[in-house]
Amino acid sequence: MPRSLDNFQNEDSSHPNEQGAWADSGSGFPNPNSNDVSNSQRNHHRHMFPLARIRSELSEQDSSISFTHDPLHIPLPNPSNNNDNIFHPQVHSSFHSRSASRQRRRSGLSRSNATRYSRRSLSDWLETIRENNYDEASIPSFFSPHTERLVGRVLRLNRYLQNSELLDRNSSTFGSNPNSVFSAQPTEPSVEPPTSSFPIQPPLPPSRSISISNPQSLSFPSSFDQSNYNFQAASTPQFNPLIEHLRRSNSPLNPSHDSAGASTFNTYFPNSTYQNILNSLDNNPAVLDLNGPPNQESSSSASSYGSRTQTPNARSCSLNIVFHKHKKVCTYYMIRHYAKRRLFITPTWWLRSGSVFRGLQFGGVQSISGLPPLTNPKERWIVDVSIHVVDYKRRALEGQLNAQARSSDPSSTISTAWTGEILDFSEKLNFATEKWSAPLEIDVCYWRKLAPFQNMDTNTFLETITNPKKLYKICQKYIFMRWKDMLILKDQTDTSESRITGFYFCCLCRENGYIQGYYYDPKHAFCSQPLNLFPEQPSLSPSYHFV
């Protein structure tokens, strides 16, 4: 039934800020501002009745107070009144600022000013740092993180330039001005050059050190009194724990000086070809680079750079640095290619339990120094190798080796049981043997004789074993192993005692199953016994099974 006209007149005559009569009617829509309505219903009806929400919540008395904290409804400042501030204090307190922003504003430096500071030139930065003395005081907190990093870089650059300037002054001849170098202190301070990226750096040879080695050779003016100044070398040898460990070790490969001052290194290997290997490593540029950056004057020609020799301590320390990086190759490569599941060692059909290999092994006839081998038929042995157990998970294998001379005498047969390890280039199984009386020099010489590295020089070999990509490509074609004789099963000759002390450096070709190896004997380090094995074709028999 339609309403009467009086109801419409009463609704039109109501105050515009008051609620209309239609919102309080007895229909199914409750009053959203009543106390009987829950908060969820009130919020729901606020969307349904926007006019009722605005008229009920805002009035003429409190409309200005409600909009005070809203930045969008701030009244514009009066141009005639200079005391008015654009930012209302209540509006400023409503913003949520970070602690860094508060510190910058309290110190009078805004974000834009901090950006201008960070975009300064290098000369301005150096001037600011020297004026404020940031080396002794901490960096101000009002700098942004980007500015703090930039300040740190400039500080490091400033220290490097100061060290380089002092080094240049020490290495050059002093001029006619006596106050050019010795104006600050009567005694020249010792300044160390910037350290290398390697964790342990051996001391530099005397020919490569940057220091005042001979003060009498310097030219001074006549008015300069040299007695008041004490000279000190610019680069003094630092204490190296690795070199001290090598000096105190009892290994015959590390020189130890007795009370008379004579080295026992040359007496242990007198006039042997093993000394030629060490001399070849001395002249290797890859090993020489690890001792530190060469001097600019001495590194001008490659001939003078390669003609310098190393002491045994420096050579051992250099090889330790190279093999320390080599041990991290597998870990670095696995982290980079973890999603691809790439491994250096994958199983192959040729190397499994039950595999049999047959070939020849020559006696101690081939020299490490690369001399032509002696091809005497009486010094060849027929070798049969049987693989009993292969465990790729533990990187271990076991087998038996039967060696028989070419003569018809059956008493010349030797049988040994051996255990081996498969190299996966982790921190434990890599090219560094570190056991069985095998130093790093022997590892370099014997691994280089195998087929993957046969055409490489020492420089290329050391670069390859520390490069994960190159080493991974080689492992796709070869498997590297070490075999160690553990037990003599049948001994009827006198040569078995010498063979049990050594071990084999082996590599297996994945394409055809060919095994190439070299036997190393610590008692006869100047000779290596090559081993060549070929897989026997197994006889395959048909098998049946029911489905």
UniProtKB/Swiss-Prot annotation:
It is found in: Nucleus. InterPro entries: Vacuolar_import/degrad_Vid24. Residues 1-42, 60-115, 169-217, 285-313 are annotated as: Disordered. GO terms for biological process: negative regulation of gluconeogenesis; proteasome-mediated ubiquitin-dependent protein catabolic process; protein catabolic process in the vacuole; protein targeting to vacuole. The keyword Zinc-finger does not apply. Its main location: nucleus. Substrate-recognition component of the GID/CTLH complex. In the absence of stress, the complex exists as an inactive anticipatory complex (GID(Ant)), composed of Gid1, the E3 ubiquitin-ligase Gid2, Gid5, Gid8, and the RING-like subunit Gid9, awaiting a substrate receptor to form the active E3 ligase complex. When cells are shifted to glucose-containing medium, the substrate receptor Gid4 is induced and becomes part of the complex, named GID(SR4). Additionally, Gid7 transforms the GID(SR4) E3 ligase core into a higher-order supramolecular assembly (Chelator-GID(SR4)). This is GID complex substrate-recognition subunit 10. It comes from Schizosaccharomyces pombe (strain 972 / ATCC 24843) (Fission yeast). The lineage of its organism: Eukaryota, Fungi, Dikarya, Ascomycota, Taphrinomycotina. The gene is gid10.
